Structure formats: C-alpha cells, structure tokens
Amino acid sequence: MQLVTPEGKAVYPHLNEADTDFDEDGNFSTKLAIPSEHAGDLLGKLEEFAEESYKTQCKEQKKQKLKRYNHPWEEEYDKDGQATGNILFKFKMRAKTRQGVDLRPVLVDAKKNPMTDRVGSGSKIKVAFEARGWFVPSLGAGVSLRLRGVQVIELVEYSAGTSATSLGFEEEDGFESEELPSKKSKETLVREEDKSLADADF
C-alpha cells in the first residue's frame, strides 16, 4: 500500500546520506512527528492494513495466532516523559538492493523540483512510502514503512554543530581567549547531532 503522509516535522532524518552505523550497506531513514489531529486518517489506514497483513501472515503460517511486532508508529513524548500531542512515524529505506544496486529516496521541494539541500531535524516535510507486512519467526508479524521519497515544505538545513548565537549567547565585554579560532570555528561549538534514532506522488 503506497501513501503520502500529511505534513509533519522531520526528526533525526538521514535523507542525503545513508546511515551506516549499524549496517555497512547503509539505510536512509527519518522519523516524522505529525500532530494527532492531523494523523487520524493516516493512522486509520495503517491500522487497517496492519490487521489485514496479520491475518494474511496467520493464514500463510497456518496459525490461529502469531506474536505481533510493535508498529513503526507511536505517541511521541518529550524528554520529561510528557506527551507532545504528536504521533511519531518511522520510515526506512535500504541504500542497496540485494544485488548491490544503489538506492536513494527522491527529494523534492514544495514545487516538486529535485533538490540536494541537506535536510535537518525540524524541517517540515511530507513522506511518500509503502506499507509492507512481514513475518520473522523470532520477532513475529509486523509492518514496515518503506521510505520512497520526501517533499520538503520548509527546510531546516542540517548542521553538524551548534553556533554560539543559536544557543542564545550575545557578545559581551570581558574575557577574550588569546587563542582566537577562525571566525568559522569560533561560531561553531562542535556537537554531532544525536544518531539514536522510484518517483513519489506528492
């Protein structure tokens, strides 16, 4: 089942370069936070698909019941454990086929023009994806959301560092280091972004 999400905010996207931390072939991925009031229609379709997929897997495995694997969507909570009011969806795409052919998601701007800008967390995006059912004996029956493409409505460019300005600091009279870095490095406090983590019809 192929769908396009409503607009939401990208969370820890790996859309320009594949993440190879846990897979040498790499994966493209993003989480998408969608306000609950806008996610209802999508959730309904996915829940219905998941139930039909589960029944199919039970039939194929000749079982009345199978263990169910967690869905790749859930309520989002902040660092204090409070509900944000968003539903968090998880999308993934392998960077290579089993035959070694390179894959990557389609990236387009709001006008559907191809783009290469680095998409960072907080960008407002829509995701084109394919929902697929699967079964693995050790895990059970589940559903995956296979990333196909992303439309960027509002870009927040990825940055590997955090600037002094973005942290809210202002220039003050007082101590000044004798070992002044270049303007570029002065403005950037290195902090790597947390890595926890076919055409699209937009």
Task: Show which residues each predicted segment covers.
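OB-fold ssDNA-binding interfaces and closely related basic DNA-contact patches used
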Residues: 1-96
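Hydrophobic residues positioned within well-ordered beta-strands of beta-sheet architectures
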Residues: 30, 127, 145-148
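Short, basic/aromatic beta-hairpin or loop at an interaction surface
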Residues: 91-107
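Eukaryotic short linear interaction motifs
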Residues: 98, 134-136, 159
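Exposed beta-sheet edge/beta-hairpin loop segments within beta-rich domains
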Residues: 106-125, 134-143
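OB-fold/S1-family single-stranded nucleic acid-binding modules
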Residues: 137-157
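Acidic, gly/ser/pro-rich intrinsically disordered tails
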Residues: 157-202
